[in-house]
Amino acid sequence: MFTPCSFSVALPALKAGEILCLACGADDVPAGASRAIAVVRPEDLPANALPVGTVLGAESGALLKIEGRAFWPGWERALFLARVLADISSGVRILKTARAGCALAVVTLSDKGFAGLREDESGPALVDMVRKGLPLCHERRFLLPDEPARLRALVLELAGQGYDLVISTGGTGLSPRDLTPEALIPVLDRRLPGFEQVMMAASLEKTPRAVLSRALAGTVGKTLLFALPGSRRAALENLEVVLEAVPHALEKLGGDMSDCGRK
């Protein structure tokens, strides 16, 4: 569950559209860093206070939006990457955090797509479906080859950045390169068999070949994860039947303690 906070930071002059790096817990900035970097004292910023999609604002309105994080070579601390939403003059400001909606990442796994030999149709379609069913504060798409290690590393990084919902498409069949379940099951904290069963049932209504699907659902920390088939049609059919339950699942992952039973 997102907890708003406020902190003081000295900002350089910035133009809308630029990227600002926020460094937490540093006495100085990495050698060679550009001017677009600001330092926040660790005591001013609670842990996990800046998940992706967080908006930082002042009295004048929204100024920055967290879009990710990066690591400077040879420097241990993560840098938060913030998109500048409005022109900013240099000076010290009290920034307040706010976050409305969920952060979505869609990862398409396709050797041919990654090589530029096939257009990704599933990824954009999945984003559109989620956008129609959920309010989003941030969205991003990724395209990877069918390489388990790269997928596993990306999913762990996305969960660490605070993405609420991560959906992969591709690699759930029986071909030699279909290794998405093998990549993701080891990093799941919990499998969600109910979601998996509903997706399988919906697919079997369309074709008996759906028995070959190894689509899965689970959690990585507070991130909800779905691994869907690579076919655009199959991926959308799977997502459609579970999307209604996603908001409730995200609330529970965020710490909602209310009863789940219907009255």
Indicate where each model-derived feature is located.
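N-terminal small/polar loop signature for handling phosphorylated ligands or for N-terminal nucleophile
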Residues: D128-S168, G173-V187
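A general structural motif
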Residues: R118-D120, P145-R152, L204-A210
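Short beta-strand segments
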Residues: V107-L109, S168-T169, A227-P229
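Short coil/turn connectors at secondary-structure junctions
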Residues: G101-L104, Q161-Y163, V220-T223
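Internal alpha/beta core interface subdomains
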Residues: V29-A31, D87, G91-V92, R99-A103, ...
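Proline/glycine-rich low-complexity loops and linkers
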Residues: T180-K263
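Glycine-rich phosphate/diphosphate-binding loop of Rossmann-like nucleotide-binding domains
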Residues: R93-D146
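N-terminal accessory interaction module
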Residues: M1-T97
